C-alpha cells in the first residue's frame, strides 16, 4: 500500500509498505478512501516540531476490510472515520461518551 513518509522538513515521500493485518482480536483493518493533511503534519513539514522518519497522516475515512474476532461495533464494508485522537475507552472521559476530550 502507498504510505506518506515524513523524511525531513520540506520532504515527504510516498513509499510502498505492507498492508496491515489483524494482530489482536480487537483490531480492524480499513482501506483508506480519503485522507487529509492535519495541522500537526504541517508542524513537522515546516520544521516547527521534531518527528522521526515515519508515516504521517492520522485523519481519514475508509471502508472496513477485515475485523478481529472480538470486534462487534463494525463489520466489513462499513464506512468509518478515523478521529484525530485515539481513545482507550476506559478513562472517565471515554466512559462519559466524550472519547476525544
Regions of interest found by a model, annotated:
Residues 1-2:
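Extreme N-terminal starter segment of soluble prokaryotic enzymes
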Residues 8-10, 24:
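Residue-level recognition of beta-strand termini and adjacent short loop/turns
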Residues 10-11, 70:
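Short acidic/polar mixed-charge low-complexity motifs
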Residues 11-19:
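Short glycine/threonine/proline-enriched tight-turn/helix- or strand-capping micro-motif at secondary-structure
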Residues 20-36, 45-95:
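Glycine-rich beta-strand-centered segment in the early N-terminal region that forms part
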Residues 100:
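Short, non-ligating residues that shape and space the ligands of small metal-coordination modules
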Amino acid at each position: 500500500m502507498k504510505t506518506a513518509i515524513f523524511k525531513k522538513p520540506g520532504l515527504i515521500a510516498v513509499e510502498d509498505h505492507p498492508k496491515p493485518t489483524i494482530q489482536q482480536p480487537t483490531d480492524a483493518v480499513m482501506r483508506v478512501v480519503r485522507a487529509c493533511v492535519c495541522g500537526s503534519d504541517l508542524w513537522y513539514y515546516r520544521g516547527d516540531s521534531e518527528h522521526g522518519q515515519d508515516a504521517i497522516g492520522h485523519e481519514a475515512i475508509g471502508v472496513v476490510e477485515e475485523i478481529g474476532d472480538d470486534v462487534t461495533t463494525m463489520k466489513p464494508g462499513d464506512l468509518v472515520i478515523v478521529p484525530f485522537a485515539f481513545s482507550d475507552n476506559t478513562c472517565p472521559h471515554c466512559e462519559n461518551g466524550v472519547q476525544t476530550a
